[in-house]
């Protein structure tokens, strides 16, 4: 008969296996991620996609996501509750160096201190991940990305910091270019061509009744963002003290 330790180890292995299949980054309150987009922003770029996604409670607890078919404008899952509205999102591949957390939720995260003395916890990623964000009120966040494309000429020419503040109805995001070195290692540049197109990834994850189950795990796996989150009143370059912290 398995003891507590064996059961705990088994559950962790199962959770890590599920996490390895997922490639999205979902930020929690206070998290910030540093990344270099792999997407270029050019027409027909498979590494950047527009999505409509339902998020709703599943039977028996937990959450589910269901992708909207762009041809029929209907969810690809038949159990979406009546009266639900999908969230308008965009997703892109990026090379992520690290995620900075304001709370330590894992022992292997490194404690770091900013010049002002603020503590945070660094999660090393150094891998390709998908970052998904809402378009925002009046396409606010999307327009931030477009502005950066106009400045750089291509999205993959620089490094972005994406930060989430708040939760639920009080959730806001900020996106800003930063002078930080985040480069795809020369030995991994060939992997970019092999990345699964964003749309295909989302269809495989959230395109049917059996593929859309969600559980709340660590930031590089999944956390549900409410469909009615607050997305207004955040400028391109924020002046919040937390945004200015250099870790």
Model-assigned labels for residue ranges:
Residues 232-241:
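Short linear regulatory motifs embedded in intrinsically disordered, acidic Ser/Thr-rich regions
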Residues 119-231, 245-246:
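Compact mixed alphabeta submodule
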């Amino acid at each position: 008969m398995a003891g507590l330790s064996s059961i705990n180890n088994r559950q962790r292995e199962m959770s890590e296996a599920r996490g390895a299949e997922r490639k999205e980054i979902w930020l929690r309150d206070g998290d910030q991620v540093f990344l270099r987009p792999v997407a270029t922003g050019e027409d027909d770029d498979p590494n950047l996609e527009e999505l409509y996604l339902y998020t709703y409670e599943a039977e028996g607890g937990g959450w589910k996501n269901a992708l909207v078919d762009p041809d029929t404008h209907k969810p690809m899952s038949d159990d979406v509750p009546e009266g639900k509205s999908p969230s308008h999102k965009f997703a892109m591949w990026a090379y992520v160096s690290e995620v900075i957390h304001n709370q330590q939720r894992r022992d292997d995260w490194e404690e770091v201190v900013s010049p002002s003395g603020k503590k945070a916890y660094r999660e090393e990623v150094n891998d390709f991940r998908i970052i998904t964000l809402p378009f925002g009120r009046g396409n606010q966040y999307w327009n931030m990305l477009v502005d950066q494309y106009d400045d750089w000429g291509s999205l993959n020419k620089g490094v972005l910091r994406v930060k989430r503040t708040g939760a639920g109805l009080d959730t806001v995001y900020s996106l800003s270019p930063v002078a930080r070195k985040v480069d795809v290692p020369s030995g991994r540049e060939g992997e970019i061509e092999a990345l699964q197109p964003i749309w295909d990834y989302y269809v495989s994850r959230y395109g049917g009744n059996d593929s859309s189950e969600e559980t709340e795990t660590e930031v590089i796996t999944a956390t549900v963002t409410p469909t009615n989150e607050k997305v207004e009143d955040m400028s391109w370059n924020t002046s919040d003290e937390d945004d200015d912290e250099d870790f």
